[in-house]
Structure formats: C-alpha cells, structure tokens
C-alpha cells in the first residue's frame, strides 16, 4: 500500500467525527445545567455518555486493528478498521446495539464484537499485544477522564463531572470484563498464544458462549458483586468518589428512577 493509501486508511470517518461532536454537545448541555438536576441535565449527560461510549468502542477496536496493522496485518486497512467507522465492525448489533442495552439495564460497559485480525503469522508476544491493545485503550481513557475530574471538578458544574465520572466508570467495567481469561474475551486471547495447541483446540468451541458468560455475570448476584467490587476499587484509586459516578449513572439512565 502506498504512503497516500495508508494515510487514507487511518483517516477518521465522518461518522466517528460526528460522534465526537455529539459527545461535545452533550457535555455542553451538561455544563449549562450547572449543579441543578433538571431536564437539561438528564439530556446532556445521556447524550454525552452514550455518544462518548460509542467513541470509546471505536477507539477500542481501533487499538486492536492498528496494533495488528503495525505488526503486519495490512488487511485491516482494506477492511476499513483504521477509519474508526463503527459500520466496519464485524457485527453492528453485537458491537453497538448490545453494549448500549447493557448500559441501559445495568450500567456495564460491555465490549463490542471484536474486529477480525490476522495474527497467525505473528510471534506469540505480538499476538498478545494485539489482544491487549483494546483494553489498554479503555484504561487510558479511564485514566484521562478520572484525572480531568480529579483536577478540574467544580461543584458549580457537578452535572458535567458526574457524567464524566460515569463514563470513566464504564471504561473500567470494560477493562475488567475484557481482561477476564474467558474464551471469547481479550484476556483469554492474550493468553491463548501461550497455551499448548491441544488446549487451544479444546477451548475454541467455548468462545461462542462468551455472550452467555456476560449475561451470567450480569444476572448472578455473587459474580455481579465481585465484578463491581473490583471496578469500584480501581475507581477509588483515582481519588474521585464513586458516588459521583453513581450520580452520573442516574442522570444517564434517568428511566431507572421510575423502573
């Protein structure tokens, strides 16, 4: 691929730029709401969190694709994975629709369906790095959002910072969930190259049940409590109170007040 073609392949799509703009609009509305819980506050935080989460999904998948591209899988550019266009993902419902549903129901940042990358020719270490690239993006976003909240929080604009804290919380839920060594998740994909071939073959069929595990994690009280306990612990390391994220969750999921 020519240098010009490479630049075209990594150029952000208009849809991704639109999602960034929508996130900014939601943030502006939340800023204007100040510290008052009013319809503008609900609308602003809802738009900011949903659009912001879609942006993070794009960046997560871009992390996988760009790392694979750097290690020699140039087909990811042909498939459009480097454009940050959500339409290029393997399955729109699993990549976008299901994560939105999980946020609506339980405030969990569910990872989307993974992009298809070719790693068979890579070294074991590089295959692991490709798998960890997506969760690394979630970690970086969480740190950025929490640092901004810690340093810039202003009670007069508490609505905005509650939304930012909740968006950071979602990044941490995605990080913890993704790093679990469960077939079908990034954590297992990072370990898989280090397993014996017969072990890989034996566990391969379990990958199709990754969604079932996510549902069990969501519905089983013990597993759910353990999962959120880890997330809250990581969140509190930032020095930002998780109560702020809880307030953001209520604003973003405003229907939970009545249902």
Curated annotation (Swiss-Prot):
Disruption phenotype: Not essential. No effect on processing of anti-sigma factors RsdA, RskA, RslA or RsmA. It comes from the Bacteria. The chain crosses the membrane at residues 14-34, 39-59, 97-117, 128-148, 156-176, 215-235. The keyword Signal does not apply. It is a multi-pass membrane protein. Its cofactor is Zn(2+). InterPro entries: Metallopeptidase_M50B, S2P-M50-like. It is found in: Cell membrane. One of its GO terms (biological process) is proteolysis. Keywords: Cell membrane, Hydrolase, Membrane, Metal-binding, Metalloprotease, Protease, Transmembrane, Transmembrane helix, Zinc. Zn(2+) binds at residues 60, 64. GO terms for cellular component: plasma membrane. GO terms for molecular function: metal ion binding; metallopeptidase activity. The active site is at residue 61. Binds 1 zinc ion per subunit. Belongs to the peptidase M50B family. This is Putative zinc metalloprotease Rip2. The lineage of its organism: Bacteria, Bacillati, Actinomycetota, Actinomycetes, Mycobacteriales.
């Amino acid at each position: 691929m020519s240098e010009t073609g490479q630049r075209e392949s990594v150029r952000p799509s208009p849809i991704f730029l639109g999602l960034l703009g929508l996130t900014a609009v939601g943030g502006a509305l939340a800023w204007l709401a100040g510290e008052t819980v009013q319809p503008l506050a609900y609308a602003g935080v809802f738009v900011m969190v949903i659009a912001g989460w879609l942006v993070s999904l794009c960046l997560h998948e871009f992390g996988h694709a760009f790392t694979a591209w750097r290690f020699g899988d140039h087909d990811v550019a042909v498939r459009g994975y480097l454009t940050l266009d959500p339409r290029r993902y393997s399955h729109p419902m699993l990549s976008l629709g299901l994560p939105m549903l999980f946020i609506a129901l339980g405030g969990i940042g569910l990872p989307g369906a993974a992009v298809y990358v070719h790693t068979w020719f890579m070294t074991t270490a590089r295959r692991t790095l490709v798998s960890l690239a997506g969760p690394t993006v979630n970690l970086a976003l969480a740190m950025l959002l929490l640092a901004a909240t810690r340093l810039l929080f202003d009670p007069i604009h508490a609505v905005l910072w509650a939304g930012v804290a909740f968006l950071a919380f979602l990044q941490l839920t995605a990080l913890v969930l993704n790093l679990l060594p469960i077939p079908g998740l990034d954590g297992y994909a990072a370990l898989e190259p280090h397993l014996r071939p017969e072990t890989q073959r034996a566990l391969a069929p379990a990958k199709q049940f990754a969604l079932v595990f996510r549902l069990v994690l969501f519905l089983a009280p013990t597993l759910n409590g353990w999962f959120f306990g880890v997330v809250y612990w990581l969140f509190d390391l930032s020095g930002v109170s998780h109560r702020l994220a809880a307030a953001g969750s209520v604003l973003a999921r405003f229907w939970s007040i009545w249902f």
